[in-house]
Amino acid sequence: HKKLGRLMWDYVGMARNEQGLKFVYEEIQTLKDLFYNDINIPGTQTFNPELEKAGRLGDFLELGQLMALDALDRNESCGGHFREEYQTEENEAKRNDDDYAYVSAWEYNQDINKSQLHKENLDFKEVKLTSRSYK
């Protein structure tokens, strides 16, 4: 879990880039392969807190990889998610409201590579979309 946490912190944090996201996606896949192929859970067949911890780690591995996939899919900077490739000359976030004005949810299909992105477009009637400057 520490390795996963470090990978997420280093590559899927607030500032990220395509190269790092692709790297972390593959690194998490390697961790998942190790985890699912070499897992050894101590304990008995009664209540086993180690089994519970292993289940949570499996979930965290899947979620971390999905977060990297989602960040790769979003080719813009927006809010607290800064893609280094998408910034203005003043190093401000460069949004792409034409392509990314939606809310989304990923459907997991037992394999991260078969996950399906569902989108619901946002219709701004009362508010006009504008970019903010933090300078």
Task: Identify the role of each PLM range.
Residues 1-135:
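Glycine- and aromatic-enriched mobile tails/lids
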